Amino acid sequence: MLKKATLQDIENYLDFSYNLSQDLTTSAFPTYLDGIKTKNDFYKSAYSSFSKSNSKILLFINNDEVLGWIDYYWIEQDHYLGFNVFNIQNNQQEVIEEFIEYSKSRYPNYTIYFGFPSDNTLSIEYLKSIDSEKIDENYVYTLSFEKYSPLECDGDIVSVNIENWNDFRDLHDKTSDIYWNSDRLFNALNSKSNKKWNIFLYYEKNILKGCIYFVYTPLLMEIFGIDYKDDFDENIMRSLLIKCLNTSKLDNQKHTTFFVEEKERKIVESVGFNFITKYELYTISLTD
C-alpha cells in the first residue's frame, strides 16, 4: 500500500531511499548517479518536497515493510504529474499500478510522466505492458567544467533578443507538443527565479539555421535542446554546443547534463561529455 510520509517517516527512511537511488535498477530520474548530485542534495530535496504545497512523499509498504519511496509533484495549470524520486526496492509493477490508481481520483485528467534508466527493466517492462506511451528515449551525458577547456566554434552565433525573438519562435515552435515552447521560454527568460535561461541562435547568410537553449540552476547547467531549420547538422550542433559550454565555463558553472539521441553521441563525446545511462520516458493519461 501507499502511505503519505510523516516527518518522522522521512527521518526514519531517508537513508534507505538514498541507498536505492545509488542503483539504476531501483531508481528513476532525476538520477543521483550522475556524479553531480550528492547525498546532501538528496536530503535537501526530500525536506523541501515535504514542505511544499504541490508535492508529497509516499512510502510503499508491503507486509509491514517499507520497500519504496515516491516523491512526486504536480503542476496544476499543465495537468502534469512528475517525480523527484521514484525508488522501489522490488514489487515495481505493484507500486506503479498502485500509484496510477492513487492518482486517478486525486488528479483527474492529469498526465503522469515516468522517466527511468533503461537499467530499471522491471519498471520499464511493466509500463510497456499497460496503456502507456513512450514519448522519449535519450542517452544521458554529463560534463565537469573543471576539466573542460574552451574550444573554437564556427558560425555567426548570437544571443536571443527582442529583435530576433520572432526568428527563434518560428524555428522552435515547429515542434508543437514540447513543454518548453517559446511562450514558456519567454516567461522564463524574464522571470526573477534562481534559474537563468540562455538561448543562442546560429545564422548563415542572415538566415536562422539552428538554436540551443539551456538553463543555469543552483546545482548545474542543463541543456534542454538544439533545434534546426532543416535536418540535423553536425557542424551546427557542434558549434552551438561549444558556444554553450564556453559561455557556461565563463559564467563559473560547475557541471552540466545533456540528453542526446544516438546520432549526437559522437559529437558530445568529442567535446568531453561522459556517458551515464540511457533514459526512457513514458506517460499515462488519467482520463475516464
Where are these regions (language model features)?
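Short, Lys/Arg-enriched, disordered terminal segments
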Residues: M1-D15, D23, S129-D131, C153-D156, ...
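Intrinsically disordered, low-complexity segments enriched in Gly and acidic/Ser/Thr residues
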Residues: K174-L250, K254
